[in-house]
Each structure stands twice: as structure tokens, then as C-alpha cells.
UniProtKB/Swiss-Prot annotation:
Pfam families in the record: Neur_chan_LBD, Neur_chan_memb
Entry GO CC: chloride channel complex; plasma membrane
Taxonomic source organism: Caenorhabditis elegans
UniProt record, GO biological process: chloride transmembrane transport
Function, as annotated: Acetylcholine-gated chloride channel subunit. Forms functional homopentameric (in vitro) and functional heteropentameric ion channels with acc-3 and acc-4 ion channel subunits. Currents in channels are triggered in response to acetylcholine, but not in response to GABA, glutamate, glycine, histamine or dopamine.
Keyword Ion transport: yes
Keyword terms: Cell membrane, Chloride, Chloride channel, Disulfide bond, Glycoprotein, Ion channel, Ion transport, Ligand-gated ion channel, Membrane, Signal, Transmembrane, Transmembrane helix, Transport
Expression by tissue: Expressed in a subset of cholinergic motor neurons including cholinergic motor neurons in the ventral cord, the retrovesicular ganglion and in head neurons such as the SMD, RMD motor neurons, the AVA and AVE command interneurons and the SAA neurons. Also expressed in a small number of glutamatergic neurons including the pharyngeal neurons MI and M3, the PLM neurons and a pair of neurons in the lateral ganglion.
Protein name: Acetylcholine-gated chloride channel subunit acc-1
This protein's encoding gene: acc-1
Top-level lineage group: Eukaryota
Amino acid sequence: MSHPGWIMVSFLTELLSQSSKGIAQSLDNCANDTEIINALLKDSYNKHYIPSHPTHVRVDMWVQEVTSVSELTQDFEIDLYINEFWEDPALVYEDMNPCKRNISFDDKVLQRLWLPNTCFINSKSAAIHESPFKNVFLMVFSNGTLWTNYRMKLTGPCDMKLKRFPFDKQKCYLTFESFNYNTGEVRMQWNQPYPVILLKRIELPDFKLVNFSVIAVEQMYPAGWWDELTVAFVFERRYGWYVLQGYIPTMVTIVISWISFYLGPRAIPARTMLGVNSLLAMTFQFGNIIRNLPRVSYVKAIDVWMLSGMLFIFLSLLELAVVGFMSRNEGLPPKVKKRKRQEDDDEGFSWKSMQTSPHLELRQFWVDKRVNSLRNDSAVPPVEDYAPMELEQPYQNITKRREKRKWMSGLRKKWRAMRELRPETVDFYSAIFFPTAYMLFNISYWSFYLTSLSEYFDEDVNIDQP
């Protein structure tokens, strides 16, 4: 009598043997790729017939590389893979005993199938890579699902806003839609959960990709409504180059222009040369930066910096002119200085009027009144016959003249005080005022532009994705 364990082992061995024979027989009888595609694409298949109304097309994108972002042409170049998925009931082959559940083909077979005819409608240029053959991939699944993949190089538009240049962020767009079919025939949608995938971290010499956003909208055309899938890439500018090549050199140039405050009022030629050279250096640095930028009509952050620096240098030249004017008599003999000072006093004499008492002015008023009456052959009435307002008029005129003399006297005192101010004093206060004002400007400038770098966009997706 056999042991029950051996009976069980014999049974399992026979079962495995029969299963292996069945699998081998099944593989021998399965339909290969050529048989399946020939059977599917026979005369009954019509590539112009829409699989369903509407056909739902799911789209996702793999970003391979961004090669450039240009301010002059306001566009960017990108290499990407675009994937499309849809179902075609005419291509179901599950009942054909296929050897594989999915079959891969090239673009030659793809041209024999119905396609949603999608494209990037806002691209400036687009091309499918050919290295060494056309980079088009087609996979047909046994349940009738199709997957197409194109490796493309595109040039898309960017919405350049340079008000914060070089501390700016730029947004570039690509819009994908079916060129031939409206929403009644083809519905487009992003493939979830990851409609856009970065194959690597995108970093350029002057930009880095920090965010992207996707959106799906319906756009109205004369022929109906179309689904549009838009992806927006957010690039943040790397401003280190501009700090090293623009901001720091201009700071040094402005500081050099302050050296003239310490050279003294007698070194006018050297101070003039220093100020003019600083202004020319600022102009050259400004032109070297903006020559690679578009000619926009608004003020950029770099413009504020450069123009403010030019203003500081120009004000230092004005201070030099004031010092030169104040020290124009320096080095002259004492007698010549005294004569010059006397001439200045004589020029200022025109500012003051004769000091007369109110009684003398009132007497002069009545004398003039009598003379005019005699010239007109008319009798001069006594004072009692004048109206009160007529008697108050000379006193009002006297008051106005006295106020005018007082104002002119104060102005003359200020002029004398300015004349007594020494050029060394002006240089001393300028050496304090200019660095302090420039430091306050720097605090305001960097606080405003560096704290307002963040621009918020709807549906932003962080690039750190699984």
C-alpha cells in the first residue's frame, strides 16, 4: 500500500506537467504582432472615423531640458516628451490570443491610425527629434488603449515683465489642443496625478525653473469650442552676475567720487577730472548691461540703481561747483580780497532801501499830493475834508514798504551768512551727507526689491515632486 504522501507528490507532478504542456501549446498558438496589426488594420478599419463621440484624450508631458530663455526675443527653448492616451474600440485584440498584452510600433503604423491631431498652437517653432530616426513611439494595448509619445524641440512665448530686472521672475507658456476636432468630437484633459514631470532639475546660467502650473480651459472659435491645455513655466533669474558686473562696480565708482571731498578746495582740476571720469564710468557700465535687454518703455530696477548712482555723482559735481565759486578769491593778495569783498557789498546794497521814519514818509505823501494839485490848478482841501479810508491809505503803503524792507533785510543776512561759509565746511558736511544718503538709498532699494521677489501664480506646483 502506497503512502499518502507519495500519492500527493505524484499528483502535483502530473498537474505541473500538464500545465507546462498547456502553456507551451498556448504560446505556440498565440497571435504575434504582425498578425494582430494586419487583422486590426484590414479594409474595414477607417482612419478617418472618430472612435467615439467624444473621444477622451489624456495628455501628460515629460520635460527633458530647457536650453535658453531670451529677453530680446521673449521666448524659451525646451526639449520634451508629449504623451497622449485614448481608447479606440476598433483596435481591441484581447480575443485574438495575443502573445503580448501590448504591442509597440513606429510612426509608419501610426500614420495608418486615427489620431486626435494635436499640436502646440502658440509655439513659434516645433520639430520632432530625428536622432537617428524620427522619435515617435506608439503602443497599442489589448483593450484598445493607444499610447503615443513624441520627443520634440519647441520654442514657446514668454510673458516678459522686466520692471524688477534683474530680480525678476518670468512666466513662459505652452498651449496644447486638437487642431481639427472641437469638444463635440475630442475632449482633452491632463493626465493625473502628474500632468508634467521633470526628468531632471532645470537650471540655466541665468535662470532656474522654480515652479510650473497647468490649466485646462475651453476656448471659443467660430467653429465651436475647443479644449486647451496650458502649462506655464516660472523661471527665476539668477542675479549674481549682475551684482558682480553691475552693482558692485557702480558702488565702487560712487565711493571713488567722494574722494574729491577730501582733496580740499584748491584741487579743483583734480576733483573735476575725478567726478567726470566717475560719471563716464557709470554711463559705460549702464550701457554694457542694457544693450542685451529689449527696449521697453518703463523703468526697471537696474535703471533705478544706475540713474540714482549718476544722480549722486552729478550732485558731487554740483558741490564741486559751489566750492569752486566760494573759493574763487583764495590765493589773491589781501588788498585784492578786500576790494572784491567791497564790490560784493556794493552789489548787495541794491537790496536795501533808505531807512526813513513813518513821519517823513507821511510828510512826503502830502507834499506829493500838493504838487499834483498845483499842477492840475486845483485847490488842496484841508486834511479834515478827507475820508477816513483816504487818510489810512498812506499808512497802509508805509506798512507794506516796511514789510518788504524787512524781508529783503533777512534775505541779505542769509546771503552774508552764505558768503561767510568756508569751502572746507561745505566739503566737511558733504563728506557726511553723501555717504549717509547713499546708505539710506541702499537700504530702501534692497529692502524693496529683495523682499518683493515672490510672485504668486494660480495652481503653482513645486518642482520637488516624486
